[in-house]
């Protein structure tokens, strides 16, 4: 049988030391907690908001931009300026630029297209 010696004064001293360590640990925990919140307060940047707030605002703005883009494309399609290619299921389309009433000029021809154009 092993010999165990219990000394009341030694045990009370040990309890006193542990109480001191508990206080030190709690104060360190409070310091760590304050250090963790300091960067989030300091990282407000030029805009005065946290990164998470800025990212949420950015995402909302991008969603609003995408909705406006889709509304614009829908409106252009309704008035006939934007045509959806046949068989295309994407949101891409071709812009139709009004009817051309004049004559197409041949870039290889330096002079007027007809004799009537020579007088212009």
UniProtKB/Swiss-Prot annotation:
Keyword Lyase tagged: no
Chief subcellular location: secreted
Subcellular location: Secreted
Keywords: Secreted
Gene Ontology cellular component list: extracellular region
Source species, domain of life: Bacteria
Keyword Secreted set for record: yes
SUPFAM superfamilies: EsxAB dimer-like
Family: Belongs to the WXG100 family. ESAT-6 subfamily.
The protein's name: ESAT-6-like protein EsxQ
